[in-house]
């Protein structure tokens, strides 16, 4: 990668895992193996065919299908050039999750049962943003003249995200003043792990023309928010936070650094890979690599306060922590960077009922560290 530039400018996607002894052919083989496990392994996979023309990703810990997982699956498929599976996931999402009435029309129910019956009638914005990005990439990779008009579908999602009040009377997914993504449309708080400035840079090229300046501003606002919400010493980010980046505790959890928050490490890595290094991302990455190096091995990980104070609560997704911390090496290198890359290179997929979230993040980190998470 050229100094100061990312893959958007250079077209270069380095294999960071070569440093851990995995060369391009080995990485490609590992990526294919993990993809096959997620989608086709009868014991360890979590993709299911539902109808002849649709399928879903199961959250194996909660036995439901979530917009998070459905959109993750679509991103996996567009990266792996599997239009057949992509279309099955998008068909399920439109058929069973898309909301047609009321304030949330145009959004997607964040949780449904595996047969499509709704568990919720509200959305979670991390699903919508991944849906839109996967659809735009599908348009670029395969075109929009087949079963679905990917470009039109992606634009419609983003139109609802920022124009919902005039379309349905509902809440926006981004605050129109500060350009920060919300945790849910009707709560004026955020989730640092929802902030994907690298997606918003591309939304600014693909969304409705009139909305493109909004997305450019959102990218800059999110980069600032990610830095602001991270602890200045440990690099830990809260799961939920106010617009001033102070932690918000929800769902009876007294600790702020927990499952959602691990994605921040992965997100700054991909922003760096695509759009180049940033001092604030480097600082966060270096700090969190140093902190987490003191918490190993994986079975020792705990839910934490942002200053690093441990609680007695075990981390629910330890594989995801190691995977995303390794990915953060793309954004910044501490003295532990090589150790984290080697640890990830030797890390197996998670098994058991909580494998869905860990292995989704594992796959994305494998793609980006292996130089194969591309801008299509």
Annotated model-derived regions:
Residues 73, 85-86, 147, 154, ...:
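Solenoid-repeat scaffolds in large eukaryotic assemblies
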Residues 30-72, 77-120:
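Internal amphipathic alpha-helical repeat/solenoid segments
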Residues 212-220, 339-345, 376:
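Alpha-helical repeat scaffolds
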Residues 81-88, 121-127, 141-148:
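Alpha-helix boundary/capping segments in eukaryotic regulatory proteins
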Residues 343-353:
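Solenoid-like repeat scaffolds
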Residues 2-34, 40, 63-67, 102-106, ...:
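Extended ligand-binding clefts on enzyme/binding-domain cores
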Residues 74-81, 130-141, 198-205, 266-273, ...:
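Short glycine/serine- and small hydrophobic-enriched flexible loop segments
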Residues 63-70, 116-142:
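Aromatic-rich carbohydrate-recognition surfaces in CAZymes
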């Amino acid at each position: 990668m050229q100094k100061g530039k990312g893959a958007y400018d250079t077209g270069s996607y380095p294999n960071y895992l070569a440093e851990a002894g995995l060369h391009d052919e080995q990485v490609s083989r590992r990526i294919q193996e993990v993809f096959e496990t997620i989608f086709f392994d009868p014991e360890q996979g979590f993709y299911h065919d539902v109808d002849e023309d649709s399928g879903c990703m199961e959250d194996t810990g909660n036995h439901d299908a979530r917009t998070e997982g459905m959109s993750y699956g679509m991103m996996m498929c567009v990266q792996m050039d599997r239009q057949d599976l992509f279309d099955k996931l998008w068909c399920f999402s439109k058929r069973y999750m898309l909301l047609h009435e009321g304030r949330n029309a145009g959004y997607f129910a964040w949780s449904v049962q595996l047969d499509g019956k709704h568990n919720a009638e509200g959305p979670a914005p991390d699903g919508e943003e991944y849906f839109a990005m996967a659809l735009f990439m599908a348009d670029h990779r395969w075109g929009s003249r087949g079963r679905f008009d990917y470009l039109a579908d992606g634009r419609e999602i983003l139109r609802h995200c920022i124009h919902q009040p005039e379309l349905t009377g509902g809440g926006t997914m981004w605050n129109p003043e500060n350009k920060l993504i919300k945790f849910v449309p009707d709560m004026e708080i955020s989730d640092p792990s929802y902030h994907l400035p690298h997606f918003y840079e591309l939304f600014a090229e693909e969304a409705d023309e009139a909305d493109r300046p909004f997305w450019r501003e959102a990218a800059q606002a999110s980069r600032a928010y990610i830095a602001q919400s991270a602890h200045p010493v440990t690099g830990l980010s809260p799961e939920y936070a106010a617009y001033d980046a102070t932690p918000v505790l929800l769902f009876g959890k007294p600790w702020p650094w927990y499952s959602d928050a691990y994605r921040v490490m992965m997100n700054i890595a991909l922003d760096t890979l695509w759009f180049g290094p940033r001092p604030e991302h480097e600082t966060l990455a270096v700090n969190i690599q140093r902190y987490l190096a003191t918490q190993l091995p994986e079975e020792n990980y705990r839910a934490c306060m942002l200053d690093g104070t441990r609680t007695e609560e075990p981390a629910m997704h330890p594989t995801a922590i190691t995977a995303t911390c390794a990915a953060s090496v793309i954004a910044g290198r501490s003295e532990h960077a090589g150790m984290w890359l080697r640890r990830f290179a030797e890390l197996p997929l998670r098994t058991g009922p909580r494998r869905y979230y860990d292995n989704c993040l594992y796959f994305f980190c494998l793609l980006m560290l292996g130089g194969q998470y591309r801008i299509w």
